[in-house]
């Protein structure tokens, strides 16, 4: 619903005039063309580092792990003002089948930009960059710094954002441009945690199957118990579907390398990969205790039931290696109110969702690390969609609006 609102000031108009929608689309398309799956972000980071430097920002490549890089840039203020981070991750979701075109060759149709990675979340990265460049090109004098963090590794625990915070980019506030919609500001979401459960058996030839212990059969019992498990928690009515968990992968075979040949041999090792979403009453420690309690009960019933819990998961598994805490940032925080106010200025509307939006608030993201570091933050980014992870797209009107809102928010924060 439209509401009374103040029009942009002359200074705001000066910044907004430096946002070229064609340039926004070109940058987004360039990013689509650079695949940057989790652990493979470096080529995209290097491209961005060069781009940001060419545009006049103070940019650097940070090596968060050997050979794994991310790009971070700063628009320096004159001093004495508040600093703000505009944050987006460059690692992208796994590629699903079913695409109707080449997923790394962007195309536009019906006001939507298509391409793999654009939704989660290269459109958000684009908005962050173009917002900062609008400020620089406007010539407006800022006292505080504006940081653009194009981080790696959000999809496996967010170690890129942690690295940025701990290596020179701790700001007074932050906006993470996750793709939840240009009229949505999220401040509350679940925590996330990955772990691996192993069951151990004893391999024997099928001719002596009775003498073996089948790790796969034991895992079937374990999965049934895990799915029925009641995780210890205090109910949060704003997140009614939490806690929740998902057994996402199961593999069993011979030995810890899962030799899948020789189906005539009883499996002696089986693993299941589990993701858990939880609220602020829970932690990694409480969840581990719940898993042990549940699996210990199976072991008490069955002397041949042997298990291990792997946490943190080995890096080679590509899972999150941290228990990312749930977040509940007060909507009264200045950065939240700035985004809300600038959305109203540009659209004439209040946000459709403020604080919690379901199911989006059941997802984890890097505001976890910012908030735990004492940095007030919120989620605000351009929305779009996908069908079973193929033909992923972003709504261009949302991308343009978010770019403008972020530019005015950074202007207000760093003025």
Pin down the residues of each PLM region.
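Metal-dependent amide/peptide-bond hydrolase catalytic core
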Residues: 1-9, 193-415
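A short linear hydrophobic-aromatic micro-motif
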Residues: 57-61, 184, 354-357
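A structural signal for isolated positions on well-ordered beta-strands in alpha/beta enzyme cores
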Residues: 60, 85, 147-149, 308
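Short acidic loop-to-helix transition motifs that present clustered carboxylates
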Residues: 65-69, 157, 181-182, 363-364
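A short, acidic/glycine-rich surface segment
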Residues: 93-95, 158-160, 182-185, 231-234, ...
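Fold-level recognition of mixed alpha/beta catalytic cores in primary-metabolism enzymes, strongest
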Residues: 113, 118-119, 123-228, 237, ...
């Amino acid at each position: 619903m439209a509401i009374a609102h103040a029009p942009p000031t002359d200074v705001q108009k000066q910044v907004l005039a430096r946002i070229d929608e064609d340039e926004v689309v070109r940058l987004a398309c360039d990013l689509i063309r650079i695949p940057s799956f989790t652990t493979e972000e470096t080529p995209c980071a290097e491209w961005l580092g060069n781009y940001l430097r060419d545009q006049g920002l103070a940019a650097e490549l940070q090596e968060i792990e050997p050979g794994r890089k991310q790009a971070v840039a700063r628009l320096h203020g004159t001093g004495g003002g508040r600093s703000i981070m505009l944050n987006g991750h460059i690692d992208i979701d796994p590629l699903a089948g079913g695409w109707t075109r080449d997923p790394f060759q962007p195309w536009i149709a019906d006001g939507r930009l298509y391409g793999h990675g654009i939704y989660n979340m290269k459109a958000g990265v684009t908005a962050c960059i173009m917002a900062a460049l609008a400020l620089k090109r406007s010539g407006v004098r800022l006292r505080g710094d504006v940081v653009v963090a194009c981080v790696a590794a959000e999809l496996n625990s967010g170690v890129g954002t942690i690295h940025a915070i701990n290596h020179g980019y701790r700001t007074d506030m932050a906006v993470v441009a996750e793709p939840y919609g240009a009229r949505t500001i999220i401040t509350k979401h679940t925590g996330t945690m990955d772990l691996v459960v192993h069951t151990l058996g004893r391999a024997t030839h099928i001719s002596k199957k009775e003498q073996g212990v089948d790790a796969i059969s034991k895992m079937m019992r374990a999965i049934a118990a895990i799915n029925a498990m009641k995780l210890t928690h205090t109910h949060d009515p704003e997140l009614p579907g939490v806690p929740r968990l998902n057994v996402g992968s199961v593999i069993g075979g011979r030995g810890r390398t899962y030799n899948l040949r020789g189906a005539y041999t009883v499996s002696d090792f089986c693993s299941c990969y589990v993701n858990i979403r939880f609220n602020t009453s829970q932690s990694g420690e409480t969840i581990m205790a719940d898993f042990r309690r549940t699996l210990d009960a199976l072991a008490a019933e069955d002397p041949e039931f042997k298990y291990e819990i792997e946490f943190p998961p080995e890096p080679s598994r590509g899972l999150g290696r941290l228990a990312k805490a749930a977040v509940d940032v007060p909507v009264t925080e200045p950065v939240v109110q700035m985004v809300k106010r600038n959305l109203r200025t540009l659209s004439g509307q209040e946000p459709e969702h403020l604080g919690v939006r379901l199911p989006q608030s059941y997802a984890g993201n890097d505001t976890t690390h910012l908030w735990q570091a004492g940095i007030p933050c919120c989620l605000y980014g351009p929305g779009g969609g996908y069908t079973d992870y193929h033909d992923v797209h972003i709504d261009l009107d949302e991308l343009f609006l978010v770019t403008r809102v972020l530019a005015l928010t950074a202007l207000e924060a760093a003025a």
